[in-house]
UniProtKB/Swiss-Prot annotation:
One of its GO terms (molecular function) is threonine-tRNA ligase activity. The lineage of its organism: Bacteria, Bacillati, Actinomycetota, Actinomycetes, Kitasatosporales. This is Threonine--tRNA ligase. Binds 1 zinc ion per subunit. It comes from the Bacteria. Residues 1-61 form the TGS domain. Its main location: cytoplasm. Homodimer.
């Protein structure tokens, strides 16, 4: 046996080892059960991979991003084996890892029931305890077709070997240049227990799966296309330890309590009537109050910052979107055309920017007018498949707080800095404080403009982002074809990350629309264009805030800021006078004049998450005072009426949480 020299790479440390031919990657890390795979030459490999001379080996820990994906992918295989042991007629689809878990699609006659999921999970536990070995083997196309002749969906995947997409998860099975099958082998006899078409890598054995749980099942089209058969998808989650699984399940329980769709119904804020269709919300009076408060504050802050408000129609001739390029790049996300005016195609607008460009171009512009900051609460419409529509966060019709800034090249850095500072400060005003920034840079395969322009713009964005003193995460190749961007990522009250605002440079539209301004020397020059969406959309931001606050909005956003609770019916007129006086100062105050007992009224308003309850009885009436009850159940008594109203007004003015 000859010697093989390899390098073990751990972060910045490099160790050279001499091993014999046939040594596997796993043998470099004996007893280290947290190591589940290896990265060799930039590619993930099983620990059973035989090392070659000169290779660099980086251990992959189970708790790393790659390690978690491998854990979850292997668990998906165990689930598929369990399903086929219990339901032999089930045909296999695709089973990739996803964020915090995995899924697998199956073609079965009947949808899985909750009892089925329990049985599948029990069978998975049996398979896990068997310690089956995951064993990789390379097969020819012909051999794969022969082995998987009874799996029609696998046969289809074999036909797209090497060109599979990550969008539908097919790349986890046939994304490489060769076909491989993973066998699950009995650890004692080596007999085949189950097999699947898969790229891998996988865990060494099923005993490396410490903690998992099946979550739910749902219908899903094969490879995400409505033209394909409907399959049954089972979702699960897997973690390196039982404690991490427990923490994740507790997190999901809390997230479910905060689900904006649930809270929207409980608090009577909005709904999605079947008569209107998926992804199209109607806001009820209380939801309308919150939305108006959000918009009014944003409008005032934009006016203070020098933005000019514009309005544009909801539909336009198709020629506009041909000019902008949307029909070339975004046609799949647009609604079909309406033929009007003797066959002219009209479209519902998916974006506001083309119309803002027409406003800029409506007359000659001078450098003295720049920067020109146009702002609109513009409603747009995007065709989303019903399977991806999700409450207010992914909808078909929504209103963007959309700004487009036109400036000179010399003004670009200052304007980007000013815009990002404004964005972050405004988000903080709504109670979001935990941010990091993401810088999306050029995709070398898809971009317009010169390399020099991109490099200069990207460096300017980088400097602007770094000035904020926030973590800056690179997103190489993540920019749209027309320019680099900064995204503001925000963590909510339970640690989930939401993409909020974007600040995007555009080298494409000013050229397409031939936008010009007159420079100081009288020459025609091209403006720099900046896209900026602060909330993303009003609806989505509404949902984020609703979940962030769990429905208990700060006083200034609460639909009802205070409710009068009379101790008895005789105290109702007194509280109604209090409410009328407060409303004259712009406060949202109601009185619960129902026939319910006082304690039930208090419980009802606690469920409604009202910031203040104003309680009054005989002594309060005699003294011209009220009692304040807070959300946490604490109470202040004997507060004079004017002082009580001023207290509510102060909480609104300071935008505080109570």
């Amino acid at each position: 046996m000859s010697d093989v020299r390899v390098i073990i790479q751990r972060d910045s440390e490099r160790e050279e080892h001499v091993v014999t031919t046939g040594t596997t990657a796993g043998e470099l890390f004996p007893g280290q059960r947290t190591v589940v795979a290896a990265r060799i030459g930039g590619e993930l490999k099983d620990l059973s991979y035989e090392l070659r001379d000169g290779e660099s080996v980086e251990p992959v820990e189970i708790s790393s991003e790659d390690g978690l994906n491998i854990l979850r992918h292997s668990t998906a295989h165990v689930m598929a084996q369990a399903v086929q042991e219990l339901f032999p007629e089930a045909k296999l689809g695709i089973g990739p890892p996803v964020k915090d878990g995995f899924y697998y699609d199956f073609d079965v006659e009947k949808p899985f029931t909750p009892e089925d999921l329990k049985a599948i999970e029990k069978k998975m536990q049996e398979i896990q305890k068997r310690g089956q070995k995951f064993s990789r083997r390379v097969v020819s196309d012909e051999a794969a077709r022969e082995e998987l002749a009874d799996e029609p969906y696998k046969l289809e995947l074999i036909g797209i070997k090497g060109s599979a997409s990550s969008d539908d998860g097919a790349d986890v099975e046939v994304g490489g240049g060769e076909l491989t099958i993973y066998d699950n082998l009995d650890p004692k006899t080596g007999d085949l227990c189950w097999k699947d078409l898969c790229r891998g890598p996988h865990l060494p054995t099923t005993r490396f799966i410490p903690a998992f749980k099946l979550m739910r099942n749902a219908a899903a089209y094969w490879r995400g296309s409505e033209k394909n058969p409907m399959l049954q998808r089972i979702y699960g989650t897997a973690w390196p330890t039982k404690d991490e699984l427990k923490a994740h399940l507790e997190f999901l329980e809390e997230a479910a309590k905060r689900d904006h769709r649930k809270l929207g119904n409980e608090l009577d804020l909005f709904s999605f009537p079947d008569e209107i269709g998926p992804g199209l919300a109607v806001f009820h009076p209380k939801g309308g109050v919150i939305r108006r408060a959000m918009e009014d504050y944003s409008r005032r802050r934009h006016e203070e910052e020098g933005y000019e408000f514009v309005y544009s129609p909801h539909a336009t001739k198709g020629k506009l979107f041909e000019k902008s390029g949307h029909l070339d790049w975004y046609a799949d996300g647009m609604y079909p055309p309406m033929q009007l005016d003797d066959g002219v195609d009209y479209y519902l607008k998916p974006m506001n920017c083309p119309m803002h460009n027409l406003i800029f171009d409506a007359r000659g512009r001078s450098y003295r007018e720049l920067p020109l900051r146009l702002f609109e609460f513009g409603t747009v419409y995007r065709y989303e498949k019903s399977g991806v529509v999700h409450g207010l966060t992914r909808s078909r019709g929504f209103t963007q707080d959309d700004a487009h800034i036109y400036c000179t090249k010399e003004q670009m850095a200052e304007e980007l800095d000013r815009t990002l500072t404004f964005v972050l400060n405004l988000l903080r005003d709504y109670g979001l404080t935990d941010f990091y920034l993401e810088l999306s840079t050029k995709d070398p395969e898809k971009y317009v403009g010169s390399d020099e322009t991109w490099e200069e713009a990207t460096e300017t964005l980088r400097q602007v982002a770094e000035k904020q003193g926030l973590p800056l995460v690179p997103d190489p190749g993540g920019a749209a074809f027309y320019g680099p961007k900064i995204s503001v990522q925000c963590k909510d009250a339970i640690g989930r990350t939401w993409q909020m605002s974007t600040v995007q440079l555009d080298f494409n539209l000013p050229e397409r629309f031939d936008l010009e301004y007159t420079g100081p020397d009288g020459s025609k020059q091209r403006p720099v264009m900046i896209h900026r969406a602060l909330f993303g959309s009003i609806e989505r931001f509404f949902a984020v805030l609703l979940e962030h606050y769990a429905g208990a909005f700060p006083v200034w956003l609460a639909p009802v800021q205070a409710v009068g609770i009379p101790i008895g019916d005789a105290h109702i007129p007194y509280l109604q006078e209090f409410a009328a006086k407060a409303r004259k100062q712009g406060l949202r105050v109601d009185v619960d004049a129902s026939s319910d007992r006082m304690q039930k009224k208090i419980r009802n308003q606690q469920k409604n998450k009202v910031p203040f309850m104003i309680i009054a009885g005989d002594e309060d009436m005699a003294n011209g005072a009220v009692s304040f009850r807070y959300r946490d159940g604490s109470q202040e008594n004997g507060i004079p009426v004017d002082e009580a109203i001023a207290k509510i007004a102060k909480a609104v003015e300071d935008r505080v949480q109570v």
